[in-house]
């Protein structure tokens, strides 16, 4: 017996050692996964990905004109490139939102980020597949400063490039153009799972009162991305396009020269790298984060019939029937259910109204903001670079702050659904008032020779106006570009050539007949408008306030939406939201705003015998029409917010009851009971607590999970 003791002791020691080693391995495993078991780490990773997504989208906008000149594209061509992102996104957003809710959401987001990285790299590829950029050096017509001056006696007819060759190159089929379109489609496809799956994943793993703050941070990063994109665009376009292939010290042009083309491809490479590395982090997160027993983890979700919600909710938000296997529904059946579920969602007035209101708010941003830089140039006589810098440093940061504050207010004030919709209505009213003030903040149209006034500073009466006059008939002036100059007589001319200036120092301008010959000079740019500087400063301040206040409605709208659908429909409902945002909020508004702006044009350029871009607008009509469209969209959004509030208020009075007395089945299902207090004793009548609004999206026959619809 004594001999066995050492053996037993030794066996027990070995067993203890094995248990100790196993415990240490378990601790190491926990340590390895602990970094990716924190929802805050996921938030940081998602923010990095959304920041990169917003950056690459804005960067494309900042280099569109560079692409147009580099590959001889028309404005319609670059418009197709810009819209290709939405086409790729629309193609898959519903499918990704539906099937993504049932799969591994972080991995799907990571795959989407890698696809976006591939699209960004393909966007830069055309520069490396085509020939180096060649510019015409020493054109006499433009002079040393790149100014369009009077070419008397046809002195420059043989100096510049062949116009026929330019037109042939412009209309030739360009495979690089198709490659750019394909790259943008890839970017749109890759962006599909990032927003809806990321939002639903975060909402499933945070406390209800913290959800608005987390979502607000997400959308803040998405809006902050465009500011980074514009800044990156301004930096890259100052670098010569072929700087990696040639010695730039031998260049005789600068970024201010009209022949300069910047390194448009550099930003796409940088964005591709950022997208790729931020996507890799997503593959480390599990499908379901470990549960946390924190107070307030209850979700203010829609209450469905039966006691399905007494079971723990999977992290992907999909509840399955306990007797139903995972593979019960075929792929075809799952596809067949999508139209039914979509119709069911849209048949709910609360869901439909809040989605349409969000579409109207986004439509203002997509339409008004898309042409805001152009508006600043036309109204306040700013340069393109100055307008973009102001937008990047003022309006966009204010919008980011507004989205963050909106989520913070919802969290700090613990707003219910009714409180959130009231906040959205108030924010809408204040921002609409700011837009109304824009009607009175602008500059009048400056007098332009041959367009708004006659040559010689006479009022525009009698015969039709014509920019060609006897003073410039022999100058061979062209209308393919707009390089305005301000004459000493206070009149703006389309170019130094139209002013009759035959010297590159802009003197001796024959069309300035109201001033002495020695003073017949012009300076580059439009003539200033009286009081325009003061109006611009006021406009800029109001624009900052408008961006700040208007953006505060975004987070409450998303919060209302995800609180008015059942958990298993959350990801799909967000997919429907983003689909409609693109269909109604991103695609039509730029077309509507653009058509309205074009209707205010006073003078069109011509290129290769065809009508080109508008170079001069009626500022007053432009301002009224441009701002009025935004006001109309904001007003429509307020009507939809009001309708949503009425629906919520009526259902609140109907379903939310005191806990005194018994409750019917319908009253019970729509009461203040949540997942955590089902089956518990009713709250005493004397105990005060915040009543939660629960809107029952599903009818009683829709009480099962998604597969029951089959």
UniProtKB/Swiss-Prot annotation:
Membrane-side (Extracellular) residue stretches: 61-79, 132-174, 244-261, 367-386, 439-539, 598-630
Signal peptide: none
CDD domains associated with the record: MFS_SLCO3_OATP3 (cd17402)
Protein name (database record): Solute carrier organic anion transporter family member 3A1
Keywords for this protein: Acetylation, Cell membrane, Disulfide bond, Glycoprotein, Ion transport, Membrane, Transmembrane, Transmembrane helix, Transport
Gene3D superfamilies: MFS general substrate transporter like domains
Catalysed reaction, written as an equation: L-thyroxine(out) = L-thyroxine(in); prostaglandin E1(out) = prostaglandin E1(in); prostaglandin E2(out) = prostaglandin E2(in); prostaglandin F2alpha(out) = prostaglandin F2alpha(in)
Pfam family, one: Kazal_2
Record's subcellular location: Basolateral cell membrane; Apical cell membrane; Basal cell membrane
Positions of the Kazal-like domain: 465-513
Entry comment describing in which tissues the protein is expressed: Expressed in many brain regions, including frontal cortex, brain stem and cerebellum. Associated with neuronal bodies in a punctated matter. Detected at the arcuate nucleus and the choroid plexus (at protein level). Little expression, if any, in oligodendrocytes. In the cardiovascular system, detected in cardiac muscle cells and endothelial cells of aorta, coronary artery and left ventricular endocardium (at protein level). In the respiratory system, detected in alveolar epithelial cells and in mucosal epithelium of the trachea (at protein level).
Example GO BP: monoatomic ion transport
The encoding gene: Slco3a1
Residues glycosylated per entry: 153, 169, 381, 457, 502, 505, 519
Bilayer topology: Multi-pass membrane protein
Disulfide bonds: 471-501, 477-497, 486-511
Stated role: Putative organic anion antiporter with apparent broad substrate specificity. Recognizes various substrates including thyroid hormone L-thyroxine, prostanoids such as prostaglandin E1 and E2, bile acids such as taurocholate, glycolate and glycochenodeoxycholate and peptide hormones such as L-arginine vasopressin, likely operating in a tissue-specific manner. The transport mechanism, its electrogenicity and potential tissue-specific counterions remain to be elucidated.
Cytoplasmic topological intervals: 1-40, 101-106, 204-222, 287-344, 411-414, 563-571, 649-705
Regions crossing the membrane: 41-60, 80-100, 107-131, 175-203, 223-243, 262-286, 345-366, 387-410, 415-438, 540-562, 572-597, 631-648
Region (Disordered): 1-25
């Amino acid at each position: 017996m004594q001999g066995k003791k050492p053996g037993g002791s030794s066996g027990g020691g070995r067993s203890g050692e094995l248990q100790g080693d196993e415990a240490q391995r378990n601790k190491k495993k926990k340590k390895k996964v602990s970094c990716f078991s924190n929802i805050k780490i996921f938030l940081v990773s998602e923010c990095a990905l959304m920041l990169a997504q917003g950056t690459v989208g804005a960067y494309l906008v900042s280099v569109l004109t560079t692409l147009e000149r580099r590959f001889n594209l028309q404005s319609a061509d670059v418009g197709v490139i810009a819209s290709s992102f939405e086409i790729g996104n629309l193609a898959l957003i519903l499918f990704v939102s539906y099937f993504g809710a049932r799969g591994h959401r972080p991995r799907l987001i990571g795959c989407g980020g890698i696809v976006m990285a591939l699209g960004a790299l393909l966007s830069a590829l055309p520069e490396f597949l085509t020939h180096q950029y060649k510019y015409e050096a020493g054109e006499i017509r433009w002079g040393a400063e790149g100014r369009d001056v009077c070419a008397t006696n046809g002195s420059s007819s043989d100096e510049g490039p062949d116009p026929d060759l330019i037109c042939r190159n412009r209309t030739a089929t360009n495979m690089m153009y198709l490659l750019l379109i394909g790259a943008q489609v890839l970017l749109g496809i890759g962006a599909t799972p990032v927003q809806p799956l990321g939002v639903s994943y975060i909402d499933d793993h945070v406390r209800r009162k913290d959800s608005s703050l987390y979502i607000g941070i997400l959308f803040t990063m998405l809006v902050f991305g465009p500011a980074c994109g514009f800044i990156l665009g301004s930096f890259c376009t100052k670098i010569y396009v072929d700087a990696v292939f040639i010695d730039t010290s031998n260049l005789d042009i600068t970024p201010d020269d009209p022949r300069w083309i910047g390194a448009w491809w550099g930003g796409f490479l940088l964005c591709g790298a950022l997208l790729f590395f931020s996507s890799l982090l997503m593959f480390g997160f599990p499908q379901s984060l470990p549960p946390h027993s924190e107070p307030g983890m209850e979700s203010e979700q829609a209450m469905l019939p039966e006691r399905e919600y007494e079971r723990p909710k999977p992290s992907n938000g999909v509840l399955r029937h306990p007797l139903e296997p995972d593979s019960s529904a075929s792929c075809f059946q799952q596809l067949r259910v999508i139209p039914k579920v979509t119709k069911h969602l849209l048949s709910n007035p609360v869901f439909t109204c809040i989605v349409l209101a969000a579409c109207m708010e986004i439509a203002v941003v997509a339409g008004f903001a898309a042409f805001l830089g152009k508006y600043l140039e036309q109204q306040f006589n700013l340069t393109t670079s100055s307008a973009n810098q102001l937008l990047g440093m003022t309006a966009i940061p204010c919008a980011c702050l507004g989205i963050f504050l909106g989520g913070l207010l919802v969290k700090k004030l613990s707003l219910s659904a009714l409180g959130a919709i009231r906040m959205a209505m108030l924010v809408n009213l204040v921002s609409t008032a700011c837009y109304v003030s824009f009607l009175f903040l602008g500059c009048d149209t400056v007098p332009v020779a041959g367009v708004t006034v006659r040559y010689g500073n006479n009022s525009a009466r009698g015969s039709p106006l014509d920019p060609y006059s006897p003073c410039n008939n022999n100058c061979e002036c062209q209308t393919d570009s707009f390089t305005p100059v301000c004459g000493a007589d206070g009149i703006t001319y389309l170019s130094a050539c139209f002013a009759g200036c035959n010297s590159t120092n802009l003197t001796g301008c024959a069309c300035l007949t109201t001033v002495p010959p020695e003073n017949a000079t012009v300076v580059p740019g439009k003539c200033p408008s009286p009081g325009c500087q003061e109006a611009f400063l006021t406009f800029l301040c109001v624009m900052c306030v408008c961006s700040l206040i208007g953006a505060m409605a975004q987070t409450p709208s998303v919060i209302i939406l995800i609180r008015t659908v059942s958990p298993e429909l959350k990801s799909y409902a967000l997919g429907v939201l983003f689909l409609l945002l693109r269909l109604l909020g991103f695609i039509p508004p730029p077309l509507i705003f653009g058509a309205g702006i074009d209707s205010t044009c006073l003078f069109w350029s011509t290129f290769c015998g065809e009508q080109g871009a508008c170079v001069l607008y009626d500022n007053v009509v432009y301002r009224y029409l441009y701002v009025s469209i935004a006001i109309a969209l904001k007003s429509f959004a307020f009507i939809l917010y009001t309708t949503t509030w009425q629906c919520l208020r009526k259902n609140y009075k109907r379903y939310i009851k005191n806990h005194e007395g018994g409750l019917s089945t319908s009253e019970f299902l729509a009461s203040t009971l949540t997942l955590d207090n089902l089956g518990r004793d009713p709250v005493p009548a004397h105990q005060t607590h915040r009543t939660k609004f629960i809107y029952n999206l599903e009818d009683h026959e829709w009480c099962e999970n998604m597969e029951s619809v089959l």
